[in-house]
Amino acid sequence: MAAIILSLTLLCLVIWLFLLLFWGQFWQVNHQLESNKIVIKKTLPTVCVVVPARNEANVIPISLRSLLLQDYTGNFTIFLVDDQSSDGTANFAQGVAYAVDKTDKLQIVSSESLPTGWTGKLWAMAQGVEKASELTPDYFLLTDADIEHDISNLRRLVTKAESQDLDLVSIMVRLRCQSFWEKLLIPAFVFFFQKLYPFFWVNNPKKTTAAAAGGCILIHREALNRIGGLQIIRQALIDDCSLAKAVKSNHGKIWLGLSTSTISLRPY
C-alpha cells in the first residue's frame, strides 16, 4: 500500500512539474488588457457593437449605459438585437439611450424566428452583424448583454488590435464572485480555462491553440468575412473558441487576456 501511495505521489509530482514547465505558463495572469497603454490616434477605426439580448431588462440599464458612454472618440454604433424578449428589453434599451442623450448611437434589431441549424444567441448575433455590415465598419465588437464595460474598454480593445495588427482581441471579463458558491467555483473555472487554453499559446501565432471569451470579442470585419462569417460556427458547442480557432486557422492573429475593470453582472 505504501508503495502505491508513493508511486501516485511521484506521478502527481511529475504531472505538475510538466504542466508548470512545459504547458504554456498557464498560471500567469500578466495578459491583462488594462496593462496596455491607451494611444489616441487622430483617425480611429469605425466600430459596430453587436449585443444579442433576450429578456435582459434587469441588466440592460447598466450594461447598455456602459456601452453608450464609452470614451472612444471614433465612430461607433450599437446594434442591440432583441431576441423575441417578453420583458420589454427593447423598450428599456431605448429608454437608456434617451436618458443619456445617445439615441443616435443605438439601433434596435428585431430578431426573426430561429432557423434550423442555428443556436439562439448566434442567430441573434448574426442578424446584428448583417445589419451592422451596412455601415461597413472596420471592427465588430461582439458582447453579451450582461457585461458592464469600463468606460475605456472599447478604446483599449481597438488600441490593442491596431497597435499589434490583430484580427481578434478578446477578454475574459471579471466574473461576479459574491456568493459562497461563486467564491468557491469561479476562481477554479478561470484557472482550469487557462489550463485548457494557455493564454501564452493562444497569443503566439506559431501555436495552434486558439480561444476567446464570448462575453467580449473585437473582430476585424475583413477577418470575419475571410472565414465565412458567423454561419461557420452556427452549431458550435463552444462558439467563442470555435470563432477564435477559425480566425487563427486562416492565418489571423488573435489575442486573449483578462480584464479587471470590465465585469459580468450575471450571478452564477
Where are these regions (language model features)?
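Short beta-strand-to-loop acidic/aromatic patch adjacent to the donor-nucleotide binding site
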Residues: 136-148
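Short, well-formed alpha-helical segments that are part of the catalytic scaffolds
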Residues: 28-35, 56-69
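N-terminal membrane-anchoring/stem segments of glycan-assembly enzymes
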Residues: 1-41, 186-187, 199
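Acceptor/aglycone-binding surface of glycosyltransferases and processive sugar-polymer synthases
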Residues: 113-127, 158-159, 163-218, 222-223
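Catalytic donor/gating beta->alpha subdomain of glycosyltransferases that bind UDP-sugars
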Residues: 161, 168-194, 222-268
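Active-site nucleotide-sugar/metal-binding loop of Leloir-type enzymes
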Residues: 123-139
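Cell-envelope/extracellular polymer assembly enzymes that use nucleotide-activated donors
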Residues: 45-48, 77
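Acidic donor-binding segment of Leloir-type glycosyltransferases
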Residues: 64-114
